[in-house]
């Protein structure tokens, strides 16, 4: 079997990053990114997601090796019909690991096209960590990372984000 890469799929249109997505787990990729792709295909949205890897160890490198492409398999009923489809998802622009490249993470605040921040952070990721300060980057908790990004956006006097936790 060939490794998934941009060389073996139909070229997706170049679209700006409009979504900053915290998390690269199965739910986020098969639900949020799949929905972005469906909206892009229908002309309802014209953007991609940049994923922020929430932990130092994650799927970022694996996704990069596949040019940020992956397959979602849909099985079930749709409009009363049985479906079993495989779709290559092309709605992810990149993955940023803030533990390795904090500057790239903060640079997301500079992107005028970025409108949305989406997260599927659980209660375990939403907790106070006294070591998480703006000066102590990268922060460990989701709220602290988000605060750092929002503060950077504020410093740049850019428009706010719509945050979907």
Residues covered by each model-derived region:
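Non-transmembrane, aqueous-exposed alpha-helical and coiled segments at domain scale
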Residues: 1-165
């Amino acid at each position: 079997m060939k490794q998934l890469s941009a060389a073996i799929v139909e070229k997706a249109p170049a679209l700006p990053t409009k979504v900053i997505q915290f998390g690269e787990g199965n739910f986020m990729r098969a639900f949020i990114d799949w929905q972005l792709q469906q909206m892009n295909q229908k002309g309802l949205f014209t953007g991609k997601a940049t994923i922020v890897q929430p932990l130092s160890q994650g799927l970022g490198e694996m996704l990069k090796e596949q040019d940020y492409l992956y397959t979602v398999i849909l099985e079930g009923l749709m409009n009363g019909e049985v479906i079993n489809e495989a779709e290559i998802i092309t709605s992810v622009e990149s993955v940023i690991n803030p533990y390795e490249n904090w500057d790239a993470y903060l640079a997301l605040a500079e992107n005028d096209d970025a409108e949305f921040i989406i997260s599927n952070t659980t209660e375990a990721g939403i907790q106070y960590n006294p070591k998480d300060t703006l000066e102590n980057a990268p922060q460990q908790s989701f709220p602290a990372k988000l605060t750092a990004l929002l503060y950077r956006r504020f410093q740049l006097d850019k428009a706010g984000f719509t945050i979907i936790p």
